[in-house]
Amino acid sequence: MEYFDMRKMSVNLWRNAAGETREICTFPPAKRDFYWRASIASIAANGEFSLFPGMERIVTLLEGGEMLLESADRFNHTLKPLQPFAFTADQVVKAKLTAGQMSMDFNIMTRLDVCKAKVRIAERTFTTFGSRGGVVFVINGAWQLGDKLLTTDQGVCWFDGRHTLRLLQPQGKLLFSEINWLAGHSPDQVQ
C-alpha cells in the first residue's frame, strides 16, 4: 500500500497553464504506459483535458463550482460535486468552469482493454471487495485503515487485497475507486 497526503504531493503544471496535477499512483508503478492511474487536478481556467487514446477517464468534482464538460457531438454534461462521470479519454473534452470558480477533481484512468474502475462515495465503515487495486481519498472525517489514521486530503493506493476502512467519527466522506481486471488480464502478469 502507498499512503499519500495531497498537501505534500509534488505538483505538475499543465502546458496550457489552465491547471495542475498531483499524481497519486500508477499501475504498474513508475511506468509511462500505465494500465491505470489516479490523480487530483486543480483547474483554474477553461480548457481541454489531455488526450489518452485507449483509456477511460472517470472524473469526480471534489471542490469548487460545477463544471460543464463538452465533447463535440458526444455529450454536454454538468459535473456536480461528488458525482463521478465517465468518458473515453481519446476524445476532445472541454471543461468550462461555472462562475469562474477554480475547481479540484479526482481522476482515475484505466486502459479500456485491460481493466475498469468504479468510483463511489462512502459515508460509513466499509470493506473493499477484494479488488486487484484501488484508491481511497478522504474528503472529510477520520478513518482507520489497519494501524493508519487517514484524515482530510489523505488517502491510500493499493494493488490487491481486501481492506477495511472504519469511520471514527459520526460523519465523514471518502472517495473510493476500485479497479477490476477484465477477463484474461491480471496485475500478476505485469509485475
UniProtKB/Swiss-Prot annotation:
Disulfides per UniProt: none
Superkingdom as given in the UniProt entry: Bacteria
Record InterPro entries: RmlC-like_jellyroll (IPR014710), RmlC_Cupin_sf (IPR011051), Uncharacterised_HutD/Ves (IPR010282), Uncharacterised_Ves (IPR023482)
Coiled-coil segments: none
Pfam families registered for this protein in UniProt: HutD
NCBIfam families: PRK11396.1 (NF008488)
Family membership noted in the UniProt record: Belongs to the Ves family.
Full protein name: Protein Ves
Organism of provenance: Shigella flexneri
Gene expressing this chain: ves
